[in-house]
Design a protein with these regions (language model features):
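N-terminal binding-site loop/beta-alpha segment at the start of enzyme catalytic domains
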Residues: 1-89, 219, 299-300
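Generic structural signal for well-ordered alpha-helices
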Residues: 17, 48, 68, 72-76, ...
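Acidic (Asp/Glu)-rich catalytic clusters
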Residues: 22-23, 72-86, 113-118, 178-181, ...
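Short, acidic/polar
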Residues: 39-52, 101-116, 172-174, 196-197
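A short, structured active-site edge motif that brings together acidic residues
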Residues: 85-99, 123-129, 191-192
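Beta/alpha (TIM)-barrel catalytic core signal, keyed to glycine-rich beta->alpha loops juxtaposed to Asp/Glu
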Residues: 128-301
Length: 301
């Protein structure tokens, strides 16, 4: 039986109503800044500055994004300007699919810590259930990700990873992991939006105490032009992006919208003190057609 860490105090800069609690006893903000495709150092700095100014306290990156060092440098520069320190920021990174396996996964995680200039991460995810260079149907994918998870468990137990989780896993992948792990995943990060509502996955994760975090909440930007979304936004006096993000948050799903525009970063933070009606939630859910704008992991053995 794993020893769960004690429930930790909420940092003073995190409003309780904007926070969820993971199965590790750690708090996690419901809103974070995604950084996919933010690589230029100045773009990273401007986006992070706008995020911190508008109350974001979670930053999501990954080894494959190629921006861990830029994010680490920007945070060291910016945090003191807002009276914040490392403990005020929930920092997530992810294992590259090329680094699956026990030894490679541990080395990759330590490399991410070095790049970010941190001695711990709040959350570290297996980015993809398959191994780069292996066909999706290769049964070796299963063994490699199990080996990676063992490495993450050790790093979690050593304190370098406060929580561990997975990204792009299906119910099948999660069932397999839960049958063999010592430390259960705290978070599942997946593509989730009205056209890909992930109802079965959400129900499964709720039953197992795994928090679901959405990426591509705007459908890579295309859903902001969807007539049904625009109608709800006009009715609410909100932007389509705010409606899409609120739709997830209102289900208890955290969101990590990405933008290089400080104005949009600010707009995306305005998710509180208003609600979509039950009818509006259902109108948006009716758009569900199983559409992936990003990657579909269902074919990975």
């Amino acid at each position: 039986m794993q020893n769960q860490p004690a429930v930790r105090e909420l940092p003073g800069s995190w409003p309780p109503e904007h926070t969820i609690w993971l199965n590790t006893g750690a708090p996690m903000p419901l809103l974070g800044l995604g950084t996919f495709r933010l690589q230029d150092k100045e773009t990273v700095r401007l986006s992070l500055n706008a995020a911190l100014e508008n109350g974001y306290r979670l930053v999501d990156t990954a080894a494959v994004y190629g921006n861990e060092a830029a994010i680490g440098n920007a945070l060291r520069e910016l945090l003191p300007h807002y009276g914040l320190s490392r403990k005020d920021i929930f920092l997530t990174s992810k294992l590259s699919p090329r680094d699956h396996g026990e030894g490679p996964a541990e080395a990759a995680c330590l490399h991410s810590l070095q790049g970010l200039g941190c001695d711990y991460l709040d959350l570290y995810l297996i980015h993809w259930p398959g191994t780069q260079g292996r066909p999706q149907e290769d049964k070796g994918n299963r063994e490699r990700r199990q080996q990676s998870w063992r490495a993450l468990e050790r790093l979690h137990e050593s304190g370098k990873l406060r929580a561990i989780g997975v990204s792009n896993y299906t119910v099948r992948h999660l069932q397999e992991l839960l049958a063999s792990c010592r430390v259960p995943p705290a978070v599942l990060q997946v593509e989730l939006h009205p056209e890909l509502a992930q109802s079965e996955l959400l129900d499964f994760c709720r039953q197992k105490g795994i928090h679901v975090q959405a990426y591509s909440s705007l459908g890579t930007g295309q859903l902001v032009r969807c007539p049904e979304v625009v109608k709800v936004a006009e009715r609410q006096g909100r932007t389509p992006a705010q409606v899409l993000l609120r739709w997830a948050v209102q289900q208890g799903v955290s969101v990590i919208p990405k933008s290089a525009s400080p104005t949009r970063v600010a707009e995306n933070s305005q998710l509180w003190n208003w609600n979509l009606t039950q009818t509006e939630m259902e109108e948006l859910r009716a758009l569900d057609c199983g559409k992936h704008y990003c990657w579909d992991p269902s074919g990975v053995v």
